[in-house]
């Protein structure tokens, strides 16, 4: 495909137009009085949202240079969302302010590389100041306030705080759509995976259609079990111990399954067979997780273990195992706490090194099952459009609350950024580097000014007033009053604020140092293909 190339000011201005188009659509959502944006979908109902990254992802511009500019800012929003789960609109507003000020200085003759170094040093100084002023979050009320602000609904904040209180900061909180109106919280004790018993005959409670085994042995096998002779030596040992047995394998079929079922019905021996969760390598990893949690071993030819020679020492144990037709829950596995902690650390390292959102999500679920628990928030609403929007808000708020617990909180409403500007006074910079630091100083005011503008106030007046207030005091845009924001429960996780600034500065530096842009040449729309037969003139259909 043919390419088109733009140089110097033309290249940078083309990128800036794309950035501005995207940022202008996103920034209307900032603050408690921000508005929503309606996104058309090819299929189904349109989506109404105030989430920066969701809006950014939908924007596709026609002009090739503008398109590249918009894509660069999408990267800011996406990276901030990946790292902190919120702050995407703030990051976009900061990027726009940094680029606008930076390009003005480049046009006036400043050296882009000098500006880049100045911006980087200034951002580092502000980040250090933010982390120094961050306040640790330790109460349920503070978590509720943080999550409530992110979701724009205090009741959602309270529910998330309750969920985090129950499952711990390592636990997973998932959000599901509900058919009933309102919000519900469901908690899962122990490790749960979405595979149930292979045969309904295994149920110990026919009314509830579930099998409950107390103080059970757990046999983990990576392959299929079909012949009973493989299983018999081990079954005899388990029967002698007097404990029930849960078999988790790729599959249990044929005479092996019928033997287990017959013994269960006769009351000779209580057991349940369950298919292992997942597929391929993911199945192996999940079986290994269960083995570590229960203190057992996965019987696999890969590690030289076979069913015929297996003894009780290779079986895992748990205080209780509850199995329904769809899922299995293992409560209080007998695994070594040190081994579990080691496995948790290993999974956490895999999460950090993973590039795929899907893989990261699956690893996060495995981490939660080992380290904490699982809480499910079920959200319902009157219409499908409202339900989607509400679910998205809750998911953002959950990640926001986790970020707050991780690194602490600072005053919200754009105040923490503006009041971190004095950190730049200590930098001894000269020339273009000093100009770069000043670009950051101007940009630090942008989020607060946008919040004030969306609330119908004069941005410049608000920024000047907040600059002269004590640390942590600022504008409460929902009431248009000034006061102590942390006390009023208006806070942001420092991880969100820090990530927004760092990611915005990273993209801004790329914009300023760009000297040429190479883009695909737009194809001209061809004339519609005519009817080769010439049609059938005079015919009236």
UniProtKB/Swiss-Prot annotation:
Any GO BP: protein refolding
List the catalytic activities from the record: ATP + H2O + a folded polypeptide = ADP + phosphate + an unfolded polypeptide
PROSITE patterns associated with the record: CHAPERONINS_CPN60 (PS00296)
Signal sequence span per UniProt? none
Q: Tell me which EC number(s) this protein carries.
A: 5.6.1.7
GO function term, MF aspect, one = ATP-dependent protein folding chaperone
SUPFAM superfamilies xref list: GroEL apical domain-like, GroEL equatorial domain-like, GroEL-intermediate domain like
Could you state one GO cellular component term attached to this entry?
cytoplasm
Q: Which domain of life is it from?
A: Bacteria
User: What compartments host this protein?
Assistant: Cytoplasm
Primary enzyme class:
isomerase
Keywords (alphabetical) are: ATP-binding, Chaperone, Cytoplasm, Isomerase, Nucleotide-binding
Keyword check for ATP-binding: yes
User: What InterPro entries would the database entry show?
Assistant: Chaperonin_Cpn60_CS (IPR018370), Cpn60/GroEL (IPR001844), Cpn60/GroEL/TCP-1 (IPR002423), GroEL-like_apical_dom_sf (IPR027409), GROEL-like_equatorial_sf (IPR027413), TCP-1-like_intermed_sf (IPR027410)
Q: What is its main location?
A: cytoplasm
Residues the record lists as binding ATP:
29-32, 86-90, 413, 492
Subunit structure, interactors included: Forms a cylinder of 14 subunits composed of two heptameric rings stacked back-to-back. Interacts with the co-chaperonin GroES.
Q: What is the similarity comment for this entry?
A: Belongs to the chaperonin (HSP60) family.
**Main role?**
Together with its co-chaperonin GroES, plays an essential role in assisting protein folding. The GroEL-GroES system forms a nano-cage that allows encapsulation of the non-native substrate proteins and provides a physical environment optimized to promote and accelerate protein folding.
Name used for this protein in its record: Chaperonin GroEL 1
User: What is the native source organism of this protein?
Assistant: Rhodococcus jostii (strain RHA1)
Q: Which gene is annotated as encoding this protein in its UniProt record? A: groEL1
């Amino acid at each position: 495909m043919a390419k088109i190339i733009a140089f110097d000011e033309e290249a940078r201005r083309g990128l800036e137009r794309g950035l501005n188009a995207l940022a202008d659509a996103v920034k209307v959502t900032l603050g408690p009085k921000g508005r929503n944006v309606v996104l058309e979908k090819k299929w189904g109902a349109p989506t109404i949202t105030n989430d920066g990254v969701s809006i950014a992802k939908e924007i596709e511009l026609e002009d090739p240079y503008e398109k590249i500019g918009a894509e660069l800012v999408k990267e800011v929003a996406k990276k901030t969302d990946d790292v902190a789960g919120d702050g995407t609109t703030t990051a976009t507003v900061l990027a726009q302010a940094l680029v606008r000020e930076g390009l003005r200085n480049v046009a006036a003759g400043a050296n882009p590389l000098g500006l880049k170094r100045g911006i980087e040093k200034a951002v580092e100084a502000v980040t250090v100041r933010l982390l120094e002023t961050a306040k640790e979050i330790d109460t349920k009320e503070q978590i509720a306030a943080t999550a409530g602000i992110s979701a724009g609904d205090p009741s959602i904040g309270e529910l998330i705080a309750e969920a985090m209180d129950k499952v711990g900061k390592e636990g997973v909180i998932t959000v599901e759509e509900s058919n009933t109106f309102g919000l519900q919280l469901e908690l899962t004790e122990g490790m749960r995976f979405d595979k149930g018993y292979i045969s309904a005959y295994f149920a110990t409670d026919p009314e509830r259609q579930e099998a409950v085994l107390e103080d059970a042995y757990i046999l983990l096998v990576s392959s299929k079990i079909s012949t009973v002779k493989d299983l018999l030596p081990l079954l005899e040992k388990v029967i002698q111990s007097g404990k029930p047995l849960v078999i988790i394998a790729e599959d249990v079929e044929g005479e092996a399954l019928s033997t287990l079922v017959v013994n269960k019905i006769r009351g000779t021996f209580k057991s349940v067979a369950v298919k292992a969760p997942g597929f391929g390598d993911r199945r192996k990893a999940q079986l290994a997780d269960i083995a570590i949690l229960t203190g057992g071993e996965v019987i696999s030819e890969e590690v030289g273990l076979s069913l015929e020679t297996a003894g009780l020492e290779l079986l895992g144990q748990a205080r209780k195992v509850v199995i329904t037709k769809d899922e299995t829950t293992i409560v209080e596995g007998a695994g070594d706490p040190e081994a579990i902690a080691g496995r948790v650390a290993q999974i956490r390292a895999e999460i950090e090194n993973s590039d795929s959102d899907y893989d990261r999500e699956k690893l996060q679920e495995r981490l939660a099952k080992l380290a904490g628990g699982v809480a499910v928030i079920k959200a319902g609403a009157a219409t499908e459009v409202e339900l989607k929007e509400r679910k998205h808000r809750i998911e953002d708020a959950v990640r926001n609350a986790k970020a707050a617990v991780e690194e602490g909180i600072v005053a919200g409403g754009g105040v923490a950024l503006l009041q971190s500007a004095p950190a730049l006074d200590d930098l001894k910079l000269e020339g273009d580097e000093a100009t770069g630091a000043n670009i950051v100083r101007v940009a630090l005011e942008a989020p607060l000014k946008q919040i004030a503008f969306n609330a119908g106030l004069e941005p410049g007046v608000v920024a000047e007033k907040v600059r002269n207030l004590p640390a942590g005091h600022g504008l409460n845009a929902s009431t248009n009053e000034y006061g102590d924001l942390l006390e009023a429960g208006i806070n942001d996780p420092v991880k969100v604020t820090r990530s927004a600034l760092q990611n915005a500065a990273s993209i801004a530096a790329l914009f300023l140092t760009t000297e040429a842009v190479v883009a695909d040449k737009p194809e001209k729309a061809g004339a519609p293909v005519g009817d080769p037969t010439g049609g059938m003139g005079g015919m009236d259909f």
